[in-house]
Amino acid sequence: MEQDKIRIKLKSYDYKLLDQSVKQIVETVKRTGSSVKGPIPLPTSRRRWVVLRSPHKFDQSREHFEIREFKRMLDIVKITPQTIESLMEISLPAGVDIEVKMRG
């Protein structure tokens, strides 16, 4: 059962962990004989919050918080059955979210 392309999207709050996971996936795919397009860095989403430090007085004193979500995308072409099996056996770190789509 061969597919034309597999698209993998990875998300993480830690870019080092994300790059390590991408490297692991790329090495696994190349070892099975398939080719990889990417990793393509996607835009980083930033969420920011401003909170008052004191609830009653000193309105000018505020704290700023930010969370950054880093994203990468991989396209795997010329897929073999060994590629699919090896991708299913990879164990990624807990801080990485992965989304896999198969396209025909």
Swiss-Prot record:
GO annotations of cellular component type: ribonucleoprotein complex; ribosome
A molecular function (GO) term: tRNA binding
One Pfam match: Ribosomal_S10
Keyword Transcription included in the entry's annotation: no
Family annotation (Gene3D superfamilies): Ribosomal protein S10 domain
Family: Belongs to the universal ribosomal protein uS10 family.
NCBIfam families hit by this protein: PRK00596.1, rpsJ_bact
Entries under HAMAP family matching the protein: Ribosomal_uS10
Name listed for the protein in its UniProt record: Small ribosomal subunit protein uS10
Organism ancestry: Bacteria, Pseudomonadati, Aquificota, Aquificia, Aquificales
Encoding gene, per UniProt annotation: rpsJ
